[in-house]
Design a protein with these regions (language model features):
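Actinobacteria-biased recognition of intrinsically disordered, low-complexity terminal regions
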Residues: 1-14, 143
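Short amphipathic alpha-helical heptad-repeat segments
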Residues: 13-36, 55, 71-87
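A structural signal for well-ordered alpha-helices, especially hydrophobic packing surfaces
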Residues: 35, 63, 67, 83, ...
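Charged, low-complexity interaction regions
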Residues: 37-49, 67-72, 91-104, 118-126
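Alpha-helical oligomerization interfaces
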Residues: 50, 54-61, 74, 78, ...
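Short, charged, intrinsically disordered terminal tails
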Residues: 120-143
């Protein structure tokens, strides 16, 4: 039996780039449902409620990072910055250790999934240059 949070084995199917935000958002909804008492499917055991809430928060952070950044590498950087901030905030009354464990696990899994998607995509230097030029035009035209 495994617990409710999915483990991302290396042989797991790749999540396409356009499905990543939805993938993380659905995982967040699932974990929040488990935290609120939804019966899990057969073969899945529930863990501590705070752990499920932490998992939900981590997946939601990943979904927000993916929706707010065009480049996957920027989303990964944002998630890593969130992790370092959490490490510096050691207040157990705000972030109980089961919540922290769930959050760390969810963000690490999301980062692994994003990196696997990035590694599977062929590098297209022309596309990267177009994105850079578009971003530069947007920044130059900003008031």
């Amino acid at each position: 039996m495994n617990d409710a949070g999915p483990d991302a084995p290396q042989d797991a199917p790749l999540v396409p780039r356009f499905k990543l935000p939805e993938h993380c958002a659905l995982a967040a909804v699932r974990e929040e449902a488990f935290a609120n008492g939804t019966t899990p499917p057969p073969g899945v055991t529930l863990v501590d409620v705070d752990t499920h809430r932490g998992l939900a928060a981590g997946y939601e952070a990943a979904a927000v990072a993916l929706r707010s950044h065009r480049r996957l590498s920027d989303a990964v950087d944002m998630l890593r910055r969130l992790m370092s901030r959490l490490e510096h905030r050691a207040d157990e009354t705000i972030y109980p250790s089961p919540w922290r464990a769930g959050y760390v696990r969810a963000v690490n899994e999301a980062v692994t999934t994003i990196e696997r998607t990035l590694a599977a995509e062929p590098f297209d230097p022309a596309r990267e240059r177009r994105l850079e030029r578009r971003v530069m035009r947007i920044e130059m035209n900003a008031p």
